[in-house]
Amino acid sequence: MSGAHTISHLSAGLKSVNIGDQQQNEANLNLLQQQLENEATSQTQQSRITQFFAQQPSDGYTLFSHRSAPNGFKVAIILSELELPFNTIFLDFNHGEQRAPEFVTINPNARVPALIDHFNDNTSIWESGAIILYLVSKYLRDNGECALWSDNIVEQSQISSWLFFQTSGHAPMIGQALHFRYFHSCPVPSAVERYTDEVRRVYGVIEMALAERREALIMDLDVENAAAYSAGTTPLSQSRYFDYPVWLVGDRATVADLSFVPWNNVVDRIGINLKVEFPEVYKWTKYMMRRPAVIRALRGD
């Protein structure tokens, strides 16, 4: 029996297992060594965050994220699309880096993502939707235009509606479905079913919106066959424009679309097959996944 195994069962099995003095001392030493190693690792992790905040860069952006956090990659996609200079610090949750006092000063919720804008007096922003709106609004102000956003207040409101739908309905429901499927302390089938059904409802909303955009696109571009499509004698799937990309707002990809990418990329883990169940969502996601900035961001570049 290894020392680690002995220690892990020590308190529960002490009355039934006869441990000699030498074995007891070895167990205690092993336990102490493990505690010291954990403390040293924790100090190293904390010092990494402390050192960063003590010597912040003078320009660019710093994104605080996590390797398994879709919302962090969501912000990385927008930074990459806008070609903004940024560095990502992937926090180590196992050692509590998200609870480091310096990090909590910029995100009182102690979660990722959070962003520091070193161009703007180290301004910090937290919550993915707020970060995205900050980035595109600032980009529009500084450059006069922003393809991912709009200078039209009506279009801005439409983009914002989808962005808030993603942050309040899409991401949390997938997150809960993942939690109850894989991480909850005991099986709760009703919770898995409830959240998975809600994810499907959310995708139904997006599917309908994209299908309406596709129909409008085909009717606008495929003029010679428009009457047949309207009469129902020729299905829209016969149009040469059936696989053209369509977007939630306007004729281009915006943050309304791109904010969905990282979560769409993991939804198969809760048993939802986008290609089969939501073909428009699948095509839409496929178009976005091919964008060079999206590829770079999802790689963690």
From Swiss-Prot:
What's in the keyword line of the UniProt record?
A: Nitrate assimilation
Q: Where is the GST N-terminal domain?
A: 59-143
Give this protein's Gene Ontology molecular function annotations: glutathione peroxidase activity; phosphoprotein binding; transcription corepressor activity
What GO cellular component term, any one, is given?
A: cytoplasm
Q: Which SUPFAM superfamilies match?
A: GST C-terminal domain-like (SSF47616), Thioredoxin-like (SSF52833)
In terms of superkingdom, the source organism counts as Eukaryota
Q: Which InterPro entries match?
A: Glutathione-S-Trfase_C-like (IPR010987), Glutathione-S-Trfase_C_sf (IPR036282), Glutathione_S-Trfase (IPR040079), Glutathione_S-Trfase_N (IPR004045), GST_C (IPR004046), Thioredoxin-like_sf (IPR036249), Ure2 (IPR017298)
Q: Which Pfam families match?
A: GST_C, GST_N
Keyword Zinc annotated:
no
Boundaries of every GST C-terminal domain copy: 152-301
**Subunit notes for this chain?**
Homodimer.
Return the protein name: Protein URE2
Organism expressing this protein natively: Meyerozyma guilliermondii (strain ATCC 6260 / CBS 566 / DSM 6381 / JCM 1539 / NBRC 10279 / NRRL Y-324) (Yeast)
